[in-house]
């Protein structure tokens, strides 16, 4: 059996209870060593086989899974954040499906949630944004033409940009090209979300690249942009005294 487990954004205590329990009983852990906090490996049994997938190819990862399955062992494939976002798990699951190897998925806390917590921010504010766009800048891995950053930026929604801090100058240019954001639109960067060395940088879209370079941030950071970081919004209807819900009669009745 293979268990795909989300490790969370960094802090070891942000892994789910289910994920921690699976690590404790695993016979083999294959972890994304470039981003997963190695402190989580302290949950492993003394005789657990541990592999760092940052040093492996997909074929090598799958070979380990096959060997463990043939021996009747439990494998945990430990991915950073939540594996459903930029986790490269589909290509693993398709092979497991084809070979009849059972597996399941345990979600984790994504770094974009951790970034909001670090900023004490809410991505969806009434009259500001009810949409969150999660994307990345095109680099060595291309993006579909219709998903170019400038096209997505045209919506003016809350933007969360993964895997792009090394291209921050191009990110800033694309955000402004979209037309909905101005140089004064609030933005922020969160480095190593929830790790001890976490750092937040607040800026605007117009000063994004300059601020990132000044902070010396070159990797392992999220970029967020949008009016949700500003001061203006309307209170929610849900807790408005005049608003009737299934559980409470409002003054509008």
Specify the residue positions occupied by each region the protein language model found.
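Class I S-adenosyl-L-methionine
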Residues: 1-109, 114
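A contiguous loop/helix-start segment that scaffolds small-molecule binding in enzyme catalytic cores
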Residues: 2, 60, 71-75, 131, ...
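Flexible, active-site-adjacent loop/turn segments at secondary-structure boundaries
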Residues: 12-13, 38, 83-84, 107, ...
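A generic local structural motif
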Residues: 13-18, 37-38, 62-63, 120-121, ...
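Short secondary-structure boundary/capping segments
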Residues: 20, 42, 67, 124-125, ...
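Short secondary-structure transition/capping segments
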Residues: 43-44, 63-64, 116-120, 136-137, ...
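Class I SAM-dependent methyltransferase SAM-binding "motif I" and its flanking Rossmann-like core
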Residues: 84-155, 199-202
């Amino acid at each position: 059996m293979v268990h795909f487990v989300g490790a969370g954004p960094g802090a070891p205590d942000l892994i789910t209870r289910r994920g921690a329990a699976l690590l404790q009983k695993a016979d083999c852990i294959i972890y994304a060593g470039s981003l997963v906090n190695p402190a989580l490996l302290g949950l492993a049994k003394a005789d657990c086989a541990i592999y760092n997938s940052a040093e492996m190819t997909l074929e090598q990862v799958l070979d380990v899974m096959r060997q463990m399955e043939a021996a009747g062992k439990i494998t945990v494939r430990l991915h950073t954040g939540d594996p459903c976002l930029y986790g490269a798990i589909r290509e693993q699951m398709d092979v497991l499906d084809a070979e009849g190897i059972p597996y399941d998925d345990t979600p984790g806390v994504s770094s974009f949630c951790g970034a909001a917590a670090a900023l004490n921010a809410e991505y969806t504010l009434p009259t500001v944004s009810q949409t969150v766009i999660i994307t990345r800048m095109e680099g060595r891995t291309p993006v579909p033409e219709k998903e170019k950053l400038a096209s997505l930026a045209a919506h003016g929604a809350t933007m969360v940009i993964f895997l792009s801090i090394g291209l921050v100058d191009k990110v800033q240019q694309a955000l402004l090209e979209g037309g909905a954001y101005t140089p004064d639109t609030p933005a922020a960067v969160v480095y190593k979300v929830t790790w001890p060395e976490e750092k937040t940088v607040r800026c605007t879209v117009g000063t994004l690249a300059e601020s990132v370079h000044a902070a010396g941030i070159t990797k392992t950071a999220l970029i967020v942009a949008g009016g949700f970081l500003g001061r203006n919004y309307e209170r929610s209807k849900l807790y408005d005294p005049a608003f009737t819900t299934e559980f409470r009669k409002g003054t509008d009745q």
